[in-house]
A protein has these predicted regions:
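Catalytic domains of riboflavin
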Residues: 1-167
Length: 168
């Protein structure tokens, strides 16, 4: 959750530790749009252009063109999305290894992290960096049962049964 940013809860996982089971859990229980936060250097190395030249998103979320890894089938299954995320983590991956557009939505974090932009993209990449992992994380907004955004304390109730914590 960000205090001055989007004021919503996201589930976050490290890209280096992704599994199909974790993707399935997140999409089932968080229910929002699954995205992949990445550092700018990864976006540049993989030649992932911004989705739109002039970003008019009020929060400044930096979506790139969507991607699927070249070995995936439809791209949408938890297995295919985990495969794509693992490929984004791989330092040997090349731009031609990805189909564009795809079913995974990379978001580019600001270099200054949460000090530059107080968003879930930057928070998740910062967490990956602090863990000594590649600057790749997967995130998903937490929705209420009725489909509206879960705000605190609602999102805490959604994650509490699973032993997940809150980081502000």
């Amino acid at each position: 959750m960000t205090k001055t940013g989007e004021a919503e809860g996201d589930m976050i996982g490290l890209g280096s530790r992704v599994t199909p089971e974790k993707i399935n859990f997140m999409t089932k229980h968080a229910r929002g749009l699954l995205c992949i936060s990445i550092g700018r250097e990864i976006a540049e190395r993989l030649e992932l252009p911004q989705m739109w030249q002039e970003n008019t998103d009020p929060f400044g979320t930096a979506f790139t063109v969507s991607v699927d890894y070249k070995t995936t089938t439809t791209g949408i299954s938890a297995y295919d999305r985990a495969t794509t995320i693992k490929a984004l983590v791989d330092p040997e991956a090349k731009p031609e290894d990805f189909f564009k557009p795809g079913h995974c939505f990379p978001l580019v974090a600001k270099d200054g992290g949460v000090l530059e932009r107080n968003g879930h993209t930057e928070a998740s990449v910062t967490l990956a960096r602090l863990a000594g992992e590649a600057e790749v994380a997967y995130i998903c907004e937490i929705l209420k049962e009725d489909g509206h955004m879960a705000r605190r304390p609602e999102f805490e109730y959604r994650i509490e049964p699973y032993g997940k914590g809150v980081c502000e």
